[in-house]
């Protein structure tokens, strides 16, 4: 089959998936549909929860392994959609629907590239993995299926990157902060205001800058994104809760940043939700990155998180669609973007020597 036929298959599958609500933790019906198509294309597969994987029939444990990966879950549709988010509509080159851009286009394009590469000469094994719960970094997503997969040497993650290679990705750590005071009547000089107790620490957090800045990822960034305190106007609040969003570059591990904050923010109590989502990258001299450069693609660093953070091997993001369309109303992807992605994946993989 020519690329056009594979593109048609990709578009058909994408429309089917858009029509199936697959918000994180509810991907079972979408996984069923994917399994149906894998059977139709004679691709024996494994399944763990709502994660699916397919390995090449000429598997050789003595060869290195490349994984193509994308996720099947979506976020919830925002209120400002002007269309039915679960009704796939094609208007010319545009396909509208929830998950079309993030990450449906990458999902179907990586699968078609996998199908093509089964018939091309390779010195490596190829594996395709569709993962669940990516949008929430859930325990039943990639981390659940990873122990069941063979050893992987390198991966391409099909996130929307405007088909440019994101060879580095910032890590993420979410911290819950608490300040404590003593309640009292606001009209009298009594009580200890928990909001005021937190102010010095929050001002320090706002003004502090980590010294080591990354060429690809920039500086490690900390933002207070949620704050909750007080019950009514005439009561001095005795507790304050806030959330810190921390985006780390490759120079700072999440554990180090957390311990550093605990030493500096002495008025507040801090609790990290997880340390596992570290910054990740692939060396610029890696054969796959060199193939990207030969193709005229421009490597960059991504501030957003993906399943790449959970991969203990070299990986980078490369996929159709634009990151700015993700999680937005009237989400869309272009058919031409999917076709170009399939062609690009095949170019990178066909001449690759691992």
Residue ranges of model-derived segments:
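Active-site metal-coordination/substrate-binding segment of hydrolases
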Residues: 63-127
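Hydrophobic/aromatic beta-strand patches that form the interior of the parallel beta-sheet core
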Residues: 66-68, 129, 154-156, 316-318
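Acidic/histidine-rich catalytic neighborhood of metal-dependent amide-processing enzymes
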Residues: 108-174, 178
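Buried hydrophobic packing segments
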Residues: 34, 107-117, 145, 198-201, ...
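Metal-dependent amide/peptide-bond hydrolase catalytic core
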Residues: 2-5, 167, 174-354
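Short glycine/proline-enriched coil/turn segments at helix->beta-strand junctions
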Residues: 39-44, 48-50, 62-63, 119-123, ...
